[in-house]
Design a protein with these regions (language model features):
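A charged helix-plus-loop insertion that forms the helical arch/lid used to bind
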Residues: 87-101
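N-terminal, polar/charged subdomain of small-to-medium soluble alpha/beta proteins
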Residues: 1-88, 103-150
Length: 150
């Protein structure tokens, strides 16, 4: 499971010209799921994201988490994060989980993160053609991979 976490002032996702979800200050999370991912991967990633200390404290030091600041989260499924580009110039998405695996894990991820943040999490629509708008804050962008925990 891979996530690109961006600290934002605000973000929204639209489908067919209609806003589906919008958030204020917090994280826009692009989430890629592969066939080998499990609930344990989602649990680890949700805990890390909720506790990630990248918001400024009173001294201007990145020392506060999304939980600490009461920030919001918007999670958008992004199968292209699982791209393999080792061979040739056209990315392969063979590692990306199919709908039968990815949809339940995506829903589990958003429910788990919502429980940790004690508030609803905004979502896109799995498999839809979406337009994502955001205003980066910092910018602060963190990439996490449950198969490569650095």
């Amino acid at each position: 499971m891979r996530a690109v976490i961006q600290r934002v002032r605000h973000a929204s996702v639209s489908i067919g010209g209609q806003v589906k979800s919008a958030i204020g200050p917090g994280f826009l999370i692009l989430l890629g799921i592969e066939a080998a991912d499990t609930h344990e991967d989602a649990d680890w990633l949700c805990r890390k994201i909720a506790a990630l200390r990248v918001f400024d404290d009173a001294d201007g030091v990145m020392n506060r988490s999304l939980i600490d600041v009461g920030g919001e989260a918007l999670v958008v499924s992004q199968f292209t994060l699982m791209a393999s580009y080792k061979k040739g110039n056209r990315p392969s998405y063979i590692r990306a989980a199919g709908h039968d695996i990815a949809i339940p894990l995506y829903e589990y991820f958003t429910q788990t993160l919502s429980g940790l943040l004690l508030q609803p999490v905004g979502t896109g629509e799995f498999g839809a053609d979406m337009q994502v708008e955001l205003l980066n804050d910092g910018p602060v962008t963190i990439c996490m991979d449950t198969k490569n925990k650095e």
